[in-house]
Amino acid sequence: MKILLIIGSTGVGKTDLSINYSKKYNAPVVVLDRIQCFPELSITSGRPDESEYFGSKRIYLTDLLVEPGNENIKKTFYVNKLINILNEIKNNYDTQNLPNEKGYGCIFEGGSISLLKELLTKINKLPYKITCVIYIRPSDSIDNHKLYKAKIFKRVSQMLFPTEEGNDSQILEVKRILNKGKTVNAQGEINLEYYEKIKQVLISLVGLVGIEDVIHFLDKQYDQKNITSKLDPNYLNEIQSQLIETITLAHYNYALSQIELIDSLIKQLPKSIEYCLKNIEIN
C-alpha cells in the first residue's frame, strides 16, 4: 500500500490538496494533527466541518476530551493509533479501486510539529512505508510573507469574530470548555480548582497559538451576545482588534516554527522516497 504524505505550515492549503488526492485515488485522509484529536477544539485547531470533506473520507487518530491528563498523552500513543488505523485501511484495501499503478492507498496530512518529528525521524521503523512527500511551503520573499501573515490575519479574524451571524467562534468554543470547569458545590460555590485545571489543560495544548489571550479576554467577562450594552463600541472595537493582532502573531510565529522544523526534517528523508516541494505564492 502506497502512502502519500502532504505536509506544510498552517494556512497553505494542505486540506484542499489532501481532499483532491483522496477523491482522485479513492483513498482516506489520515490527519496527523494532535490538536484536531480534540473535537471540542475544532475551531481553534482548524478542524474542518464534515460539509467541507466534499465526499472524501477523513480519519482522525482519536477523539479526546479537553480534560486533565489528556494534555500529557505521549507521542507514542498517537503513533500506535496511526499504526492501528493503517492496519485497518490495509485490511480493507482493494488495489482494483485505484485508477492506476501509482495510486495511493492512504493520504497523510500533517500537521503537528511533535507528530511530524516523531514520524519523519522514525520513518524507517514504521511497518508501512511512505512513498511520496509533498511539502507545501510559502516562498521566502518578504512580500510573500507579508501576504502570508495577512492571510492568517483574515483567518484569525473570522475564527474569533465571524462576520456571518450565527457562526460559531473560538471565543464561544473556549468559553464552553472553561464552563465545564465551573462546577458548583452544595453551597452554590464555583469549584475554582477544577476550573484552573481546565484552563491549564488548554494552555498546555494550544498555548503556542495565543490561547491565554483568549482566556484573559473571557476572564474579563466578555459576552458576545450583550457586550454592546456593557461597553462603549469604540472600546469594544479596540479590544477586539488587539486580540486579533495578538492571535495572528501567535499563529504566524507558530507557522514559522513549523517551516523551520519541516525544512530540517526534509533533509533527512531517505532517498527512496519521492519528494516534491511546492513553493507557493500567497494570493
Curated annotation (Swiss-Prot):
Its EC number is 2.5.1.27. One of its GO terms (biological process) is sporulation resulting in formation of a cellular spore. This is Adenylate dimethylallyltransferase. Transfers dimethylallyl groups to AMP as part of the biosynthesis of cytokinin phytohormones like isopentenyl adenine or discadenine which controle spore formation and viability. Belongs to the isopentenyl transferase family. The gene is iptA. It is an enzyme of class 2 (transferase). It holds the Pfam family IPT. It catalyses: dimethylallyl diphosphate + AMP = N(6)-(dimethylallyl)adenosine 5'-phosphate + diphosphate. It comes from Dictyostelium discoideum. The lineage of its organism: Eukaryota, Amoebozoa, Evosea, Eumycetozoa, Dictyostelia. Signal peptide: none annotated.
